[in-house]
């Protein structure tokens, strides 16, 4: 038996990496009976049948798992936003952050296309990123001339997953980092201000201290797994200040003696972050039940 990590999955064949050696594996029938499928990122134990082929016997317990796209055991989720084309959106960024925290993922923020951004807009984005840094996020704002290799190798060890809207430059970023990958990229649609999906599956690529993965771009975000009363926990500063609210289950909307509302009034919480919380709270409160 060998133990390795699934780095690629296409048509039911799972490519497993074992110290740089790749094996094409398939799961045993037991997984189908249990209606359980391995995903990219899984640590698996498999039996070698032929040269570089085998059958998966066991999938070890996952530390975490992103559902869309399916990838597991993520050490850091890098949320990639572009400054322009498509335009930087704190609302979209906050929604990605909520998704990340709902799956217990560590998140950091990468903003691209600085070289295409007017100076005034750069200043505006830098000011917004300072707010996120004060909340506790690591942020970077990069342009075409920035050294991607230096950036990636400075990131934490383990599995890094790039996630974000279509057209923000995830595949372009990886092509600069590893030109031999030659990943397909697309210009964004001028009419829709968003990109086409060029990455169609998740694949892990080796880096100095782990792996890095591109993921298919999102056209819509799914919050079906999140309850309205959980959302406050995924806005980190609301969660932090909410610990001293009068009521333990305070949703920071109309409740008396709410410390979050107090911190908002004195400027310790950004108004746009609180507004995005309210929007998402109302959206999830009013969603229709799916059967």
Curated annotation (Swiss-Prot):
Residues that, per the record, bind Zn(2+): 245, 250, 252, 258
GO biological process: ribosomal small subunit biogenesis
Enzyme Commission designation: 3.6.1.-
First-listed, main subcellular location of the protein, grouped into a coarse class: cytoplasm
Taxonomy, superkingdom: Bacteria
Binding site for GTP: 112-115, 164-172
One Pfam short name: RsgA_GTPase
Nucleotide-binding is among the record's keywords: yes
Extent of the signal sequence: none
Subcellular locations according to the entry: Cytoplasm
GO molecular function annotation: GTP binding; GTPase activity; metal ion binding; rRNA binding
Cofactors that this protein relies on: Zn(2+)
InterPro entries cross-referenced by the UniProt entry: G_CP_dom, NA-bd_OB-fold, P-loop_NTPase, Ribosome_biogen_GTPase_RsgA, RsgA_GTPase_dom, RsgA_N
GO CC terms: cytoplasm
Keywords linked to the UniProt accession: Cytoplasm, GTP-binding, Hydrolase, Metal-binding, Nucleotide-binding, Ribosome biogenesis, RNA-binding, rRNA-binding, Zinc
Every CP-type G domain range: 63-221
Details of cofactor binding: Binds 1 zinc ion per subunit.
HAMAP family for this protein: GTPase_RsgA
Protein family per UniProt: Belongs to the TRAFAC class YlqF/YawG GTPase family. RsgA subfamily.
Assembly with partners or alone: Monomer. Associates with 30S ribosomal subunit, binds 16S rRNA.
Function: One of several proteins that assist in the late maturation steps of the functional core of the 30S ribosomal subunit. Helps release RbfA from mature subunits. May play a role in the assembly of ribosomal proteins into the subunit. Circularly permuted GTPase that catalyzes slow GTP hydrolysis, GTPase activity is stimulated by the 30S ribosomal subunit.
Protein name: Small ribosomal subunit biogenesis GTPase RsgA
Native source species: Staphylococcus aureus (strain COL)
């Amino acid at each position: 038996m060998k133990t390795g990590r699934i780095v690629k999955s296409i048509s039911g064949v799972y490519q497993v990496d074992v110290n740089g050696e790749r094996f094409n594996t398939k799961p045993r029938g037991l997984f189908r009976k249990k209606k359980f499928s391995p995903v990219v990122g899984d640590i698996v134990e498999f039996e070698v049948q032929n040269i570089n082929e085998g059958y998966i016997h066991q999938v070890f317990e996952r530390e975490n798992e992103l559902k869309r796209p399916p990838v597991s055991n993520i050490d850091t989720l890098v949320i990639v936003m572009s400054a322009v084309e498509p335009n930087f959106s704190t609302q979209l960024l906050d929604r990605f952050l909520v998704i990340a925290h709902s799956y217990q993922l560590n998140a950091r923020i990468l903003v691209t296309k600085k070289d295409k951004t007017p100076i005034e807009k750069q200043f505006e984005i830098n000011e917004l990123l300072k707010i996120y840094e004060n909340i506790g996020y690591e942020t970077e704002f990069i342009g075409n001339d920035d050294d991607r290799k230096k950036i990636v190798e400075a990131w934490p060890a383990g599995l890094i997953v790039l996630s974000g809207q279509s057209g923000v430059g995830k595949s372009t970023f990886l092509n600069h980092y590893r030109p031999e990958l030659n990943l397909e990229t697309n210009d964004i649609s001028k009419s829709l201000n968003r990109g086409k999906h060029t990455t169609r599956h998740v694949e892990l690529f080796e880096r100095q201290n782990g792996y890095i993965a591109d993921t298919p771009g999102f056209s819509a975000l799914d919050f079906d797994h999140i309850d309205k009363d959980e959302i406050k926990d995924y806005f980190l500063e609301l969660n932090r200040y909410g610990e001293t609210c009068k009521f333990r289950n305070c949703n920071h909307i109309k409740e008396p003696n709410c410390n979050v509302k107090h911190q908002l009034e004195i400027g310790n919480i950004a108004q746009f972050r609180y507004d995005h919380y309210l929007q998402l709270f109302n959206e999830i409160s009013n969603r229709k039940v799916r059967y």
